[in-house]
Amino acid sequence: AQDPRVHVRLYDGLALCFLGFPDQALRLCADARRYADASRHPFSEAMAQTISLRVHQLRGETATVAGQANAAIALCEEHEFVHYLAMSHILRGWARTQQESFEEGITEIQEGLSKERAIGALLFETYSLGLLADACIKNKRYTQALEFLQQVKLDEENTDHFYAAEIHRLLGETY
C-alpha cells in the first residue's frame, strides 16, 4: 500500500518540472515528503525520497542529489524496495558523473539500470539511458553516448515517452 497524498504530489511535481515549473515541482515534492515522514510508512518515504531526487536531478542540483541519495539508498535497502533502490543508485551515479567521478558514476548508473531490467521495471529505462548518454556527452565520449542512446526504444511498444524530447536532443549532440 502507499499514501495517495504522497504519490499524487510526487508525480504532479515531476510533471510540473517537465512543463517548466521547477520551483512548483520542488514545493509539491517537499509536501509529499512531509506527508510521507508523518505517515511513517516506509514505502511512501522511499518513494518520496527517490522521486524528489529525480526532481533535483532535473533541476541540475548535483550537490543535493549527492547529499540525499545515501539516505534513500539506506531506506530502500532496509525495506528491500528494489525498484526505488535501483533508482536511488542511478541518481547517485548521475551525481558522481557530475562531480569528477565519471567512471564510478557510469558504473553505478549501469548497475542500477541492470537491477531495474532484472525485475522488469522499465518505466524509467529511457530516462536512465538518457542520464548515461548525457554524462558521456559532457565528458566528450560521444561514441559511448551513442551506444547508450541506441538502446532506447522509442516505438509503439514502449509507452515510456516522457523523456523522448531529451533523447532526441542528446542524439543531436552526439553527431
Name what the model sees in each region:
Residues 1-4:
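Short, flexible, glycine-rich and Lys/Arg-enriched loop motifs at helix boundaries
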Residues 9-175:
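Helix-coil-helix junctions within alpha-helical repeat/solenoid scaffolds
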